[in-house]
Regions:
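Acidic donor-binding/catalytic loop of UDP-sugar-dependent glycosyltransferases
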Residues: 1
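Intrinsically disordered, low-complexity segments enriched in polar/charged residues with Gly/Pro
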Residues: 4-5, 37, 75, 138
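A short, conserved acidic/glycine-rich loop-to-beta-strand motif
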Residues: 5-15
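Conserved nucleotide-sugar donor-binding catalytic segment
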Residues: 13-14, 19-111
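C-terminal subregions of glycosyltransferases and related glycan-biosynthesis enzymes
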Residues: 44, 61-62, 71-72, 76-77, ...
Length: 212
């Protein structure tokens, strides 16, 4: 494809996921998100399948100077730059296996690690919004970021993330999806705290009965 079409700057395909902890294959990574706009919202390009033009790689390093940036990911900024300057081509077939570890930059059981990763993605997205002057995409990026944070609130231990509740209160969701995430997150946290209160009441009554 790179040889046939000069306007194509990079190609990629899909990968099958292998979960190291469970020792099983499950799911796939890789979508037809070849536009700058779609990639700005979500990175769906498996790095191990990518083939890009050498001249684009050298120009990216010279212009963006990624080694000077404090980014957690080295591949995502490059995909955004290539999608903005050139075009990606998506091959809808599986050409590799992506091994998911229990602890890595993008996959972790730590709430703080998740937040670090999301914040780093957001920094990269903001950088390329400024770079491309596509400020019309800012709300779109913020909505997706907020949705991921609400999901984290629902999925993780609520005691761990109560320090982040103040952040959620400052967000003014504009889309219906994000509003529902926020309502659901608040409900689940209240439900969890109520359960803790009931458990404490039960334990106190049990203790009093034993000591009678």
């Amino acid at each position: 494809m790179l040889e046939k079409k000069i306007e194509i700057g990079g190609v990629y395909s899909r990968v099958q996921c292998y979960f190291q902890g469970h020792r099983k294959f499950e799911g796939y990574i890789g979508k037809d998100y070849i536009s700058f706009e779609n990639l700005l919202r979500e990175n769906t390009i498996p790095t191990l399948t990518v083939l890009i033009r050498k001249e684009l790689l050298l120009k990216y390093i010279e212009e963006i100077k990624p080694e000077r940036q404090n980014w957690e990911m080295g591949d995502y900024p490059m995909w955004l730059w290539i999608a903005y300057k050139s075009k990606f081509y998506f091959m809808n077939e599986i050409t590799g296996v992506y091994r998911i570890l229990n602890e890595s930059v993008s996959h972790s059981d730590s709430v703080d690690r998740h937040i670090e990763f999301y914040n780093s993605c957001r920094d990269i997205q903001h950088y390329f919004i400024d770079y491309s002057h596509r400020f019309d995409l800012l709300n779109w990026v913020e909505e997706y970021y907020n949705s991921r944070m609400y999901q984290l609130c629902l999925e993780q231990n609520y005691i761990e993330i109560k320090s982040y509740r103040d952040y959620f209160k400052t967000i003014k969701p504009t889309s219906f999806k994000t509003k529902m995430f926020k309502i659901s997150a608040n409900y689940r946290i209240c439900e969890y705290l109520m359960k803790i209160c009931l458990q404490n009441i039960f334990i106190r009554k049990l203790y009093n009965n034993i000591n009678k």
